[in-house]
């Protein structure tokens, strides 16, 4: 017998890829129709992230790769070229937190892109209106603690 619990995923804020280098405000809402986002994804379904980015007024160009893509030097060169050809008062590269780990750890990541590269973390929100059982959070913590941990290896 299993219990069904409900949650949803939310993309939250913008975080700089390289903390010391980001010249722009970190809020999506600070982007305007004069700005452009180069959205780089290596996820199975980029549509929810695209929808979130469309909420701000900036124009969006998408570079989509397969799920769990291992970004190569050639991919980063394409990203740099595409970024160079973007129009906009401010141009930023946005990716998921998981893709950011894969991309930003590459030693061949272009230095010129570092100040303009951000990631959008994913947050899991428990739906209390559907999960009103007593002790739900305690049960959830126990279940999570029992799960084996997988670690991504840096590329």
Sequence positions of predicted segments:
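C-terminal accessory "lid"/substrate-recognition subdomains
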Residues: 1-89, 149-155
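Short, conserved active-site loop motifs that form the nucleotide-linked donor/cofactor pocket
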Residues: 4, 91, 115-117
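Short, flexible loop segments at boundaries between secondary-structure elements
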Residues: 10-12, 66-69, 113-145
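Short aromatic-enriched loop/helix-cap "lid" or pocket-rim segments at secondary-structure transitions
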Residues: 18-20, 106-107, 132
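Short active-site-adjacent structural elements
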Residues: 48, 71-73, 101-106, 126-130
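Short, aromatic/basic amphipathic alpha-helical patches
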Residues: 53-54, 104-114, 136
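Hydrophobic alpha-helical segments
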Residues: 82, 86-89, 106, 110, ...
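Acidic beta-strand-to-loop metal/phosphate-binding motif
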Residues: 90-98
